[in-house]
């Protein structure tokens, strides 16, 4: 069967010379730019590897039921930028790393445990039909599909089984851009090398090069772009200045050199928030609004000293709560966290972080077993009187939740309602033999999904800091709307691409001459 997707839709694909080159944010900008032209737009990434995920509607089953599924956060935001409803078709395969050599495999929103142990090359061939079918559906029902690649398309040791980059590009006959991070150095060599390592039929799809994170006078680039075009036949159609404050979460987290990031333009920090950066941290994108707040400093805590001057400490989500809890103890962060709580410092656990704050974690089914010889039953930090039991069934749901009568350092949250989402296997209950904790957060279904014990608060719901109501209650400040972020990205791309370049990508490639 031919891989070619036959459709009147046009596809624009963003490739990169490496991970972190800027593919995700540029794809998001293109989604909004094309949507603003009155076109029906959808994002697509055949396979994403990330523990940053969002809950979206899954496929409708034969019984008419529509379960919830999960996709990478980048494609979730790209769908919103495209003004379409995020769904599993936008990211048909999601790999969620659980250990250095193992990932949970999510196909069309559902966990496929049978594929977790399959060797990479064999698994890629099994997954490609799902990705191709999703791409075909999107191209059949949209005017433009904006596709994001992964890593580099020119990894010659992986190329034969790489369906995320050029196999997808060929199937969609996409107009491809290649973006590189010029701030790292070697940009022209990276672009030329990427181009030359691709077979001729794949090189023919490349319509433009993009230099990202450029500092200084663009005139200093000459004659580099002209010489590169003479060598490859591909023009450089965008030179994008360094821009840190675009407001979109980074695909792989918020890490910055020096271990912290401060709100831009505010030298005097009023509130220091330490987020424990364990190895299998997940859903980091939900902290982006904190990064944007004036007067807030985020610290990524990896050692006890990082917590010493913290006003707040946050234990974020985790893809493997017990392994990350063991790491936390090995770093002696457990004692530092306990001291912070004993001193009345605000301590927040979200999802996996909530589980770690409890008295015990019980894994009778081996849900978290088999990774790094960890799993089974183990003690928590003992700061919330809860017991968590892991269940093979993963709970995926969007959640409308309301805080009850929170008190102390969390009193401002009392009565605040917000929309979030849940992605977890564990179920936590308050053990009747233990000290009581105040049920602090309930879903509209009536479930208790948050507890408070003194200055310690644990919630299962992600998305707390993405709520304007929560930010107003806690910080007396609002946040930029996502729409304004997406429009800002589109405006930025429009200013820094060659005149007519973005619209020109939707036109058939003109033969040389």
From Swiss-Prot:
Annotated pathway: Cofactor biosynthesis; adenosylcobalamin biosynthesis
Gene3D superfamilies referenced in this protein's UniProt entry, alphabetically: 3.40.50.880, P-loop containing nucleotide triphosphate hydrolases
Gene Ontology MF, one: catalytic activity
Domain annotation GATase cobBQ-type: ranges: 270-470
Record bears the keyword Transcription regulation: no
Catalytic center residues: 351 (nucleophile), 462
Known function: Catalyzes amidations at positions B, D, E, and G on adenosylcobyrinic A,C-diamide. NH(2) groups are provided by glutamine, and one molecule of ATP is hydrogenolyzed for each amidation.
GO biological process: cobalamin biosynthetic process
Gene responsible for this protein: cobQ
Keyword set, alphabetical order: Cobalamin biosynthesis, Glutamine amidotransferase
Protein name according to UniProt: Cobyric acid synthase
